[in-house]
Amino acid sequence: MSEAYGAQVDGTTTRFRVRSPRAGAVQLCLFADGRETRIPMQRDGDDWCASVPQDCTGLRYGYRADGTWAPERGAWFDPAKLLVDPYAVELDRRFSFDWSLSEFGVDTAALVPRAVVPPALPDVAPAAPRFTPGGLIYELNVRALTRLHPDVPEALRGTVGALAQPAVIAHLKRLHVAAVELMPIVAWIDERHLPALGLANGWGYNPVAPMALDPGLVPGDLAELRATVAALHAEGIGVILDIVLNHTGESDVLGPILSLRGLDDAAYARRPDGTLVNDTGCGNTLDFANPAVRRLALDTLRHFVRRCGVDGFRFDLGPVLARGPGFDPQAPFFAELAADPWLADRVLIAEPWDCGPGGYQLGRFPTNWLEWNDRFRDDGRRFWRGD
């Protein structure tokens, strides 16, 4: 079995592992008492690893990767950039856009959230999904639904924990909701044009590390999500996460260097001719023909099922999951998902289009998947409007 990525506490030792095939050197950066301690990591194939002889639970950390600076070749190596662990599950703050995040040689330790070594959390007991196809799925934005709710305690408004409150559950049950579909709750960064306009991204479709919950939406981290899922399950309501695995918030060539881009962009993003492919409309596209990208995606899904008991996932821009040059209905990711003991029975919902060539793939996902159907949506809208 391959070694686990991220931070792993084993008794009195904490092991760190990150993938960066083309880096010349990688440092583990530990933050405590207002100081940064840098520890050289050792190469292990395409990975870099380090061990710290203590239980680092609660400690903040990040990485720095050194090597060639050649963005035209997918090499954004800059040791001045603090990088978030792609396998981080907890962050100490939200992301905030700053142009310094894109500038070579400008240190960003003060700007980038630090990953937090998480406390041990056992797996939930395996259970079949609470939702079966045919029931009502209620798509919701956590903050928008709860931030002004008068019957939710003020401290919980706008958070995942608010969904476990009796008033919210009663509302869902009055509507006969079979499952809630939570719009993205992992940490994201605002697109670079928004701050100057006095705007912010409220939907969350611009993630950086796919397992790291947003500290604003889920201040209690995994324990909060886990408790909320359990509370909804107790009332017969399933939980589906809207998840963005098709791109990162590092955008195009002018985007911020936050995680995968600084670790080795060419090892994660699609760029067959050296140019970033933009099948997502977000500046970059993760390469699901790459086994390492598929592993990160599968580890992410497995993490939320094992640690929190979620019932399934809605996949943003689903065709990206099956792209080589075009869409492949027999793509490896689909087969690996179907063979995974934690994931095979989950509810899987595709948004069956992206911005790439042949991007409209309604009806071509595996038979055990559900699909968003824009034709039904448009027909339904016309019917109710009387068009």
Describe the role of every protein-language-model region.
Residues 27-29:
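Beta-strand signatures of extracellular beta-sandwich domains
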Residues 88-91, 309, 324, 328-387:
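Conserved alpha/beta catalytic core and glycan-binding cleft of carbohydrate-active enzymes
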Residues 19-25, 56:
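Short proline/glycine-enriched turn/loop motifs at strand-loop junctions of beta-rich domains
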Residues 141-310, 314-339, 358-359:
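Substrate-binding/active-site clefts of carbohydrate-active enzymes
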Residues 1-13, 36, 42-139, 146-155:
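The feature marks proteins involved in alpha-glucan
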